[in-house]
Amino acid sequence: MRFAREEDSTEIYELYKKNRKIFPNITMGHITNRIKKRECIYTEGVVIIFRIHQKTVQIGDNTKSQKSDCVLNQIVTSFSNGSGSRILNRFFDYIGSLPHASGVIHLSVRSDNDRAKKFFERNEMELVDKTSWGKGKIEGDVYRKMVKGDLDMFFTPP
């Protein structure tokens, strides 16, 4: 697994353009910016764009991503050969190894994107909340995975 390099940006952008229906807002500038910040991984035709939060952020109706939590913003692959799961699990290991990251990974996905939701569930992500975009017009689901130790104590109801 490796971080994307600036020379990868055109290839990555073309991959997103092929999936414009799912990723309508991805621009070349966004990709280039994330590459410069080392928030973009590109390996075996799989792109993962992520961020380690520097402050608490509301990401679901009832869910907040805490400082040092990871948010997986986008994952896209050019093949349906298992490389997506393989690279995603290597990404989980990478986040788990970072001393400055909590080990909690969140992502949100459109509620009607059944293919992506099955993919995340196959990779042991848990549906934890709902969200919406576009002033409530687009419904979404929030998933979470914990890759460091037993963090359940932080998520038990009061």
Regions found by a protein language model. Give the residues of each.
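Conserved beta-strand-loop-alpha-helix junction that forms the acyl-donor binding cleft
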Residues: 77-79, 106-117, 133-139
